[in-house]
Regions:
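Chromodomain-type histone methyl-lysine reader module
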Residues: 1-150, 154-161, 166
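Active-site beta-strand termini and strand-to-loop segments that position acidic
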Residues: 168-170
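Polymerase palm active-site segment centered on the conserved acidic dipeptide of motif C
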Residues: 155-162, 184-192
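Histidine-centered acyl-transfer/condensation active-site motif
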Residues: 173-187
Length: 192
């Protein structure tokens, strides 16, 4: 939502956060597939004590937990190539597109203001107040974690105590690990 730059200064005591375009080639040299996204430049900022912020990332032990469950559920460590076999274990990898943009900003959180990109005709006069999280802002990872945790718990999953990014569905016997915007799930059709 576009607002006057003075609103950002009056509500936060700071100017809006600068933004930049990030271009990534999702293809290869032969068939390039460039994608661009606008990202905020807040992550490398320092807090009032001078300490730098960092984005939290869950440990890879969560992924190891899900894959270990997939290997040990039925006790058979031999591959089962029959797609209709009831002992077959399925491991699914899902990447959520634009994950942080799916997380709404809690109205109780302080507002986050960003500069408009130079291509916008209102750049320099107005700034943007975020209604959803944006890559590069400090609360983005926490907002996304809150969003997917609430959704999975609402679907009947139980959140792990030792590793809060591992979820288990006791009825469907599905284990899921979340690492940023990547979901890894395992499920056995039926164990003997």
């Amino acid at each position: 939502m576009k607002v006057p730059i003075s609103e950002a200064r009056s509500r936060t005591g700071r100017p809006p956060i600068s933004v930049r375009w990030v271009d990534v080639n999702k293809g290869d040299d032969m068939v390039p597939n460039y994608r661009s996204r606008l990202a905020a430049r807040q992550m490398k900022a320092l807090d009032s004590s001078g300490a730098s912020y960092f984005a939290p990332a869950p440990p890879l032990e969560a992924l190891r937990t899900v894959l270990s469950l997939a290997m040990t559920k039925c006790g058979n460590h031999q591959p089962d190539w029959d797609p209709l076999s009831p002992q077959r274990v399925q491991v699914s990898l899902v990447d959520v597109k634009r994950a942080y943009f799916n997380a709404k900003i809690d109205p109780e959180e302080p507002a986050t203001f960003v500069k408009l990109p130079s291509e916008d005709p209102d750049a320099g006069k107005l700034c943007g107040r975020l209604l959803r999280h944006m890559y590069g802002t400090r609360p983005a990872a926490d907002g996304w974690q809150e969003e997917y945790s609430t959704m999975l718990v609402g679907l009947g999953f139980r959140q792990g105590g030792a590793s809060p990014n591992v979820f288990y569905h006791p009825v469907r016997k599905i284990a899921t690990s979340v690492h940023g915007d990547d979901f890894t799930s395992e499920r056995t059709k039926r164990c003997p």
